[in-house]
């Protein structure tokens, strides 16, 4: 595994990690969750499992995330899609004969869903892990808490605030522009797996997820006829049991390989 930097058309950069095995059968673009980064534990599982199955991986840092070049770009949804597109262009240029797959966690799955539905792309299979299918609901609320009201006040005064999903993750700079992006990017309304090709999707979700309601995930899967694998005693991280992270990636490998 080594680190790589890919330049985008807008002049910004995508900081990545790359692992391509010999006799590679395809390359997975991995996209992390909100306030996570390419250093996340899920990427570590992918780096261990995918090459053993003959699959390569490029795991990216989304704009405004991580500690490297991607952090310098303000978080906006189009910028996130641009990052995926730039990595995909690199793969097609460097490995023109290999198929491309997508693996997204939480916010990353939300972004991949938007990408598949609004951009030309070459990949035809995507795996959604703990997908934030209702991502706008996490920020845009009718009755925000006192803490959320304080952050909204900061954004009104300064134009931004910092937010992280928990104390273990690096805070992300949230702007009014990102709020506007969320207002116009409802995945339940926008998602269309067939708009830019016959895309196939599978999902995995924890039944005890307190970040993204599993019933929302079920509703999304049923609406778009997507196979979904539920893990009975798992939360949003899908990492409560020692073997769950491997089991989730095994599902993705099987899906990509069939």
What do the PLM-derived regions correspond to, one by one?
Residues 110, 122-219, 223, 227-230, ...:
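The alpha/beta-hydrolase serine catalytic core
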Residues 35-47, 215:
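The serine-hydrolase catalytic nucleophile loop
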Residues 65-95:
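Catalytic nucleophile-loop/oxyanion-hole region of alpha/beta-hydrolase
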Residues 104-112:
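Gly/Ala-rich beta-loop-alpha elbow adjacent to hydrolase catalytic centers
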Residues 1-21:
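N-terminal cap/lid segment of alpha/beta-hydrolase-fold proteins
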Residues 102-104, 129:
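Short beta-strand immediately N-terminal to the catalytic nucleophile in serine-hydrolase-like folds
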Residues 43, 47-69:
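Conserved alpha/beta-hydrolase
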Residues 25-33:
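Short beta-strand element of the alpha/beta-hydrolase
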């Amino acid at each position: 595994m080594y680190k790589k930097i890919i330049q985008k058309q807008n002049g910004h950069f995508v900081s990545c990690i790359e692992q391509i095995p010999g006799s590679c059968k395809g390359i997975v673009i991995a996209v992390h969750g909100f306030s996570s980064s390419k250093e996340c534990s899920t990427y570590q599982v992918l780096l261990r499992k995918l090459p053993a199955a003959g699959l390569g991986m490029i795991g990216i840092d989304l704009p405004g995330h991580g500690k490297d070049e991607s952090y310098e770009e303000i978080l906006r949804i189009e910028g996130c899609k641009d990052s995926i597109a730039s990595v995909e262009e690199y793969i097609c240029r460097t490995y023109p004969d290999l198929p491309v797959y997508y693996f997204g966690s939480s916010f990353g799955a939300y972004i991949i869903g938007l990408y598949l539905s609004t951009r030309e792309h070459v990949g035809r299979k995507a795996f959604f892990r703990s997908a934030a299918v209702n991502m706008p609901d996490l920020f845009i609320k009718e009755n925000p808490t006192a803490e959320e009201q304080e952050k909204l006040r900061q954004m009104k005064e300064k134009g931004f605030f910092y937010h992280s999903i928990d104390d273990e993750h690096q805070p992300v700079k949230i702007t009014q522009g990102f709020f506007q992006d969320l207002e116009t990017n409802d995945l339940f309304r926008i998602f269309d797996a067939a708009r830019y090709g016959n895309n196939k999707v599978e999902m995995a979700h924890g039944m005890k997820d307190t970040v993204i309601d599993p019933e929302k995930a079920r509703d999304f899967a049923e609406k778009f006829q997507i196979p979904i694998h539920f893990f009975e005693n798992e939360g949003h991280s899908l990492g409560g049991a020692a073997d769950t992270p491997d089991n989730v990636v095994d599902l993705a490998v099987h899906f990509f390989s069939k």
